[in-house]
Amino acid sequence: MSRRRAIQPSPALRIGPIELASPVVLAPMAGVTNVAFRALCRQLEQSKVGTVSGLYVCEMVTARALIERHPVTMHMTTFSADESPRSLQLYTVDPDTTYAAARMIAGEGLADHIDMNFGCPVPKVTKRGGGAALPFKRRLFGQIVAAAVRATEGTDIPVTVKFRIGIDDAHHTHLDAGRIAEAEGAAAVALHARTAAQRYSGTADWEQIARLKQHVRTIPVLGNGDIYDAGDALAMMSTTGCDGVVIGRGCLGRPWLFAELSAAFTGSPAPTPPTLGEVADIIRRHGTLLAAHFGEDKGMRDIRKHIAWYLHGFPAGSALRRALAMVKTFDELDCLLDRLDGTVPFPDSATGARGRQGSPARVALPDGWLTDPDDCRVPEGADAMGSGG
């Protein structure tokens, strides 16, 4: 399937009552899409193209930890005062816990949108039957989606579901998952076009997004995988017919990508890529936001991984990179960034894949997991394993 074909600017995306000016969603990413990163993405979109047009999703929290009101989890659900719509992703394996968490979100006004994660390929999650392993148990999957939808009845909070193609090439689940989610009242579905066995390696199979779009007719289908620039997003929508795109690793170290996407989808002029000096200022702003959220010590520890992504493809020198990777205070960060050559233009080598990729691997599953897809027993220990955020 060709990935480069011009299309006209896309219309807005509607997810339940939520209407977006561009069909773009920030994928929830653990340790990344906290309130600081989301605020930075929105601020850059506003400053560069004058819009805040997409949906920016909070990093995943576990349903069990949420209803237990674990302090770390509650802190993870922080939203900016001007953030709208507020979008929260739940990791969940139990219909009862799902219902309680969704009722809590709705009753306490914690968010305006609930997404559910059935796409995590991490072995410690799948070996207990959670994440990307769970949609194989189609009855249990349906009960979980139905519980969240039932808990939000009478509110304006839409429930959406994100999943992968399946466990591996021999066990595709995405068409059943899409059909079930649609039937149980989900407002949209999103497909990461890789199997759990692929993890983040190889190439996303956009053909499976097209198949899901043909299979799910009454709600939006969003595509995720291998979108690193606006051209990729336009190509995915053109070639698959999907209704929107979900941006994950492509925005790591490039939070201005959402401004570029907004411009592409609205037909506006593309913003000029930042120079190294402008990237340094963005890092400073990111560090300020992280320090406000976590405190300076943790905020500076958190910014370290982002700096490696920000400087990808730029000339910085190994000594300066090492110093930035150990930064402890904002003043130190500020001084080190002053040593960069601010006149360096954005290099072509700074685009493309970034973040974790790894290699494909056999998916860790509970014993006997693949025996009966209609077994609706809650996997033992999977709900509690993530308690604490």
UniProtKB/Swiss-Prot annotation:
Keywords: Flavoprotein, FMN, NADP, Oxidoreductase, RNA-binding, tRNA processing, tRNA-binding. PROSITE patterns: UPF0034. GO terms for molecular function: flavin adenine dinucleotide binding; tRNA binding; tRNA dihydrouridine synthase activity. Its cofactor is FMN. InterPro entries: Aldolase_TIM, DUS-like_FMN-bd, DUS_fam, DusB-like, tRNA-dHydroUridine_Synthase_C, tRNA_hU_synthase_CS. Belongs to the Dus family. This is Probable tRNA-dihydrouridine synthase. The lineage of its organism: Bacteria, Bacillati, Actinomycetota, Actinomycetes, Mycobacteriales.
